Amino acid sequence: MGDLPGGGGGAAGGAGAAGGGGGGGNGAAGSSSSGGGASGSGGGGPGSSGLPTTNGLGVAGTAGPNVDRPPSPARLSHTSEKHPKVTLTELNMLRRHRELCDVVLNVGGRKIFAHRVILSACSSYFCAMFTGELEESRQTEVTIRDIDENAMELLIDFCYTAHIIVEESNVQTLLPAACLLQLVEIQDICCEFLKRQLDPTNCLGIRAFADTHSCRELLRIADKFTQHNFQEVMESEEFLLLPVSQLVDIICSDELNVRSEEQVFNAVMSWLKYNVAERRQHLAQVLQHVRLPLLSPKFLVGTVGSDLLVRSDEACRDLVDEAKNYLLLPQERPLMQGPRTRPRKPTRRGEVLFAVGGWCSGDAIASVERFDPQTNDWKMVAPMSKRRCGVGVAVLNDLLYAVGGHDGQSYLNSIERYDPQTNQWSCDVAPTTSCRTSVGVAVLDGFLYAVGGQDGVQCLNHVERYDPKDNKWGKVAPMTTRRLGVAVAVLGGYLYAIGGSDGQCPLNTVERYDPRQNKWVAVNPMSTRRKHLGCAVFNNYIYAVGGRDDCMELSSAERYNPLTNTWSPIVAMTSRRSGVGLAVVNGQLYAVGGFDGSAYLKTIEVYDPETNQWRLCGCMNYRRLGGGVGVMRAPQTENYMWCDNNSSNNNNNNYNLKHQQQQPQQQQQQQQQQTQQQL
């Protein structure tokens, strides 16, 4: 399997059988389990069973000395899958019939009968209440305030049935109740439901709700949604009703998705004029977060500077003067840099991640699934025509390429290409000159490179590249080292080959290819030997995570700084992952699948460079080892962001995001002349 890590083994054991006979006189007893026998003289007397005594010597009716013997290897272990469900069902029936209940919860005007042990096992809140020194621990009736009685009944039902239905009519009472009772699973379900309901008319309300109940992940998603869809959000009634603090939180974001800063100013003025009498006192506080120096001179003078509310406020006039100075004095701009002069950089929208092929349940697979980080959903797309483990995956010209791999029986040189617009794979791509599995694939200067791998006979150092215009592969300079399970990355116009195995042992060496000189040159090695690692470029660093060294699968990670030619460690992932995929989607770094030394993984985790932490953030539909990952823009023909195909509210929630383009920057001389004319 291309030296992909794998695991599994079996053990078999046997048990001997013993038999004995007994009777009067000189009856004999024998046993045979491994070629041995025993006979006894003076057999069993009347009433003797003829069975071996507890000394295990196989002599009927004979009392022997106490001898420690290992237990018989013949045994049957059983774990019931039905038992938990049956037990819960019976406990719920007892509750319904008010049998053996030892506590009554008074919630609102309703009495809810229950068993303390069940509530304590499910809820940390109840566990603290009933097992501590609180007065409620000795009461048979407990009053619980500040919670909706219908929500409480649903949550108690969940404790007994493991089933709950979250819907629009109950989510706003269920989530606070689940927070109070510390039912984390229900909190997560409620937040997931609300994420799927996000649209421009309700995202601000959901954001405030998440903030109130400390649902950090929902708050983050609602913030991202608001930023991505600000042009629609600013037209909603919720936006006009925002308190000033929340308005400031939104417009100060670098990731606000607007065509120009004019939209931000217009949004602020719409909010202000919705209630001028109460809000005009906040104008300067809000306007300082509008990046006035980035406005066009015409708009700054003709619209902002001439607005009566702006002109009547001294602090606002100062902000306008600051912007004029910035536009009039380009030579002084380096000294005038600050939050208001920093261009907004909205996250690239509509990126989705594809997980392609891999190894699952003892065989190579052809399945492909797509991950949308904004909805945290994995959805199956069209499978490849061949099963491929150890496949190389890259995106070229908005098409996803799957290169080589192993189909479970043979090594492949065939290639398939996926078009997200049609959700179809085509096989009309020219094959590589060599069969390759555990191959590294990347795109550089419009060419698709296939690096290293193995062909079933040997580990390869061959490198070839594909020209999509001619549909041909051509060889380039080989690497200095043979590498299978190699990771590749493109940074600064170079192609890096990182780690892998030379067929004998894992490598920590790194080399990079210069296409201008058609030459590979070694750079500083990693601190750890790694094969079947994950690799991606993130914030101008090359990240290398997981893989396997000489002994075990790895969770450790490190990153390469090309400016200093050094590797430095970062925090380890939450799981060991060999055969892991690594990719950057919408400005976040994701580690996908792999093998932890005992099981194939379908979990994914995301890295936060600010906190230097990884966190689990979902699961694929399939466990995948040695699959490839690729990132693409979602197709424009599909309602791809913030929608759930299974949602009953599809018609309300599905809409296309419009791709916005930054206006091209004027040449400095032209801009200066125009600025002087207009100011």
UniProtKB/Swiss-Prot annotation:
Residues 645-679 have a biased composition (Low complexity). One of its GO terms (molecular function) is actin binding. InterPro entries: BACK, BTB-kelch_protein, BTB/POZ_dom, Gal_Oxase/kelch_b-propeller, Kelch-typ_b-propeller, Kelch_1, SKP1/BTB/POZ_sf. CDD domains: BACK_KLHL20, BTB_POZ_KLHL20_KLEIP. Signal peptide: none annotated. Residues 101-168 form the BTB domain. The keyword Repeat applies. Residues 1-84, 643-679 are annotated as: Disordered. Kelch repeats lie at residues 352-398, 400-446, 447-493, 495-540, 542-587, 588-634. It holds the Pfam family Kelch_1. Residues 203-305 form the BACK domain. The keyword Thylakoid does not apply. Probable substrate-specific adapter of an E3 ubiquitin-protein ligase complex which mediates the ubiquitination and subsequent proteasomal degradation of target proteins. May have a role in synapse differentiation and growth. This is Kelch-like protein diablo. It comes from Drosophila willistoni.
